[in-house]
């Protein structure tokens, strides 16, 4: 799609007034340049909007590029926005077996080398699980990292034991029950204010969760993020938290041990 038409497609609310969640996602999807790079025995799917310095967005676990749907149009006004579906999630194929952090990062490294010109500086942005993937990918391009931004990074805490009561959407007997399970889980995991859990948020969760085909907690070490950050000393970094995030207090309690000491 020509850049001017893409910009027109990205204008307006997310969603626009009267636009259904499905139509909103379709608008962003059809306006994107779809790119494919190798991943295991299949492909890794990337979406690109805008032009300028590259900004790479890394989504959270059980997610896809749509985790960034409210950010894309703003950032694409000044930058080239790249959103990849991480291996085993969203539209991307499974990574090679046995699964490991390294095989996930390998796929990102191959993709970046294919899609972005050599030596061009890159901004890396990660949400939750995506923060660990962003940081470890950035480590392979250390001389090209313009900045690293991490949002809600539970791996920057010393504990994973935050009590949450989740509902199984898989065992829901009706579409309505399944929808409410996704709404409940968003409230437990991601969104503190009930009024912010709109139909778009629940729709995205309902489409992303069933496409998660790997359990990353089983093979990605908890210290993978902090170890990458140690290797990235000197890189401009930004760490963003919601003050009601269950892990935020744990982050503050862990900061002296995990961040300041390193």
Regions found by a protein language model. Name each.
Residues 159, 176-234:
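Conserved alpha/beta-hydrolase catalytic His-Asp/Glu region
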Residues 67-69, 92-98, 160-162, 250-251:
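Conserved catalytic-core motifs of eukaryotic protein kinase domains, centered on the activation segment
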Residues 238-262:
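Conserved loop-alpha-helix segment in the C-terminal half of the alpha/beta-hydrolase fold
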Residues 132-139, 146-176:
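Flexible "cap/lid" loop of the alpha/beta hydrolase fold
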Residues 39, 82-126:
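Active-site loop/oxyanion-hole signature of alpha/beta-hydrolase fold enzymes
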